């Protein structure tokens, strides 16, 4: 084999070994790209507040009827009230 071919193959193999297989664009993507704005408070089983440095406030809800997870619009009135109540409760501790 030619030395140039061997060198190129070695570089390609080294690049493949170094890579973790995940594209950079996926590692910084926000979990909630779309928000549901018609979710009633009574249909929510559990809320999870995601705090990531690169994304705005994100709230994920698990629904009661089908156990599905959806991203809820943080501007909903009942979400704002819930967050305010939770913050006040935490400040009193």
Swiss-Prot record:
Disulfide bonding pattern of the chain: 30-55, 32-71
Gene3D superfamilies associated with the record: 2.40.50.40
Gene induction: Down-regulated by 12-O-tetradecanoylphorbol 13-acetate (TPA), with 5-fold decrease in expression levels at 1 hour after TPA treatment, 12-fold decrease at 4 hours, undetectable levels after 8 hours and low-level expression returning at 24 hours after treatment. Down-regulated by serum stimulation, with expression levels reaching their minimum at 4 hours after stimulation and returning back to normal levels at 16 hours after stimulation.
UniProt-annotated site: Important for dimer formation, residues: 46
GO terms for MF: chemokine activity; chemokine receptor binding; growth factor activity; integrin binding
Region annotation (Receptor and heparin binding) ranges: 29-33
Biological function: Chemoattractant active on T-lymphocytes and monocytes but not neutrophils. Activates the C-X-C chemokine receptor CXCR4 to induce a rapid and transient rise in the level of intracellular calcium ions and chemotaxis. Also binds to atypical chemokine receptor ACKR3, which activates the beta-arrestin pathway and acts as a scavenger receptor for SDF-1. Binds to the allosteric site (site 2) of integrins and activates integrins ITGAV:ITGB3, ITGA4:ITGB1 and ITGA5:ITGB1 in a CXCR4-independent manner.
The protein's name in its UniProt record: Stromal cell-derived factor 1
Lineage: Eukaryota, Metazoa, Chordata, Craniata, Vertebrata
């Amino acid at each position: 084999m030619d030395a140039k071919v061997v060198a190129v193959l070695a570089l390609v193999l080294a690049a493949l070994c170094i890579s973790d297989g995940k594209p950079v664009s996926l590692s910084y993507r926000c979990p909630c790209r779309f928000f549901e704005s018609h979710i009633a408070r009574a249909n929510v089983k559990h809320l999870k507040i995601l705090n990531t440095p690169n994304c705005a406030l994100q709230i994920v809800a698990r629904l009661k009827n089908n156990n599905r997870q959806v991203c809820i619009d943080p501007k909903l009135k009942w979400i704002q009230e819930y967050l305010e109540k939770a913050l006040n409760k935490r400040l009193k501790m």
